[in-house]
Curated annotation (Swiss-Prot):
Matches recorded under Pfam families: ApbA, ApbA_C
Catalysed transformations (reactions): (R)-pantoate + NADP(+) = 2-dehydropantoate + NADPH + H(+)
NCBIfam families reported for this sequence: apbA_panE, PRK06522.1-2
UniProt: NADP(+) binding residues: G7, S8, G9, A10, M11, G12, N102, A128, E268
EC number: 1.1.1.169
Record keyword tRNA processing present: no
Function text: Catalyzes the NADPH-dependent reduction of ketopantoate into pantoic acid.
Family assignment from sequence similarity: Belongs to the ketopantoate reductase family.
GO biological processes: pantothenate biosynthetic process
Pathway terms, separated by semicolons: Cofactor biosynthesis; (R)-pantothenate biosynthesis; (R)-pantoate from 3-methyl-2-oxobutanoate: step 2/2
Species of the source: Streptococcus pyogenes serotype M1
Name of the molecule in the record: 2-dehydropantoate 2-reductase
Amino acid sequence: MLVYIAGSGAMGCRFGYQISKTNNDVILLDNWEDHINAIKENGLVVTGDVEETVKLPIMKPTEATQEADLIILFTKAMQLPQMLQDIKGIIGKETKVLCLLNGLGHEDVIRQYIPEHNILMGVTVWTAGLEGPGRAHLQGVGALNLQSMDPSNQEAGHQVADLLNEANLNATYDENVVPNIWRKACVNGTMNSTCALLDCTIGELFASEDGLKMVKEIIHEFVIVGQAEGVELNEEEITQYVMDTSVKAAHHYPSMHQDLVQNHRLTEIDFINGAVNTKGEKLGINTPYCRMITELVHAKEAVLNIQ
């Protein structure tokens, strides 16, 4: 198969690197000039569990011409419409498009560009880091769940899961992936935005009595909105999952902290807490915590003059 990685940041590099070890062809797509040039000149430098430099083709999305068998979307959520516009030319009748973006509502965006027959939605707990242009730090293990959005095209989902398992990415075909997507979004909604606003680690947030109260209110808002949309969510189970995750990740600053506080980049808040607030408004459900957190993050972006 010819596999394109649409958005070759840390996670895109992980998937591209691991898939390149199989009998499939991989092309990385990105718009970051320094990253493109570094990989073209020196290869992708991988550190962490393995130390290796691999030659991988990389180009801008608009430069790709060869029809794809599989496209894995890893772009930032706010860049998704532009990416889909840029790669329209490589999407054929049977091209499979797998979305592994964090957050909620991406399937609605993707459907505007791609028939449902071609769309796969998924969620992953793999992690990765970028140490600079062309340098990916890959440590630890993960897994992912995926599902075909078209019930009549489950075979495509199983094919993609098989390919990802060849690359040791621990993929499972999931008959009902949407609750897992919401559960991960809820983890991000309780940790990412809050730690970014409070400038603290996950452990510091959860050690605070007020922090923990806020976390539980956020979980409740995610659950009631998700349930109103018909998603099977159990508040007790999700609360336990969030608590367990907070223990494992106690020393980490989450990715939104890196974006907002450390690197002064725009965040994906509109696709996490903001998505719950927007959905809640449409459903007549009040979500005061998600609304306030979204407004505070946007205010912080404005204060820092992030464009």
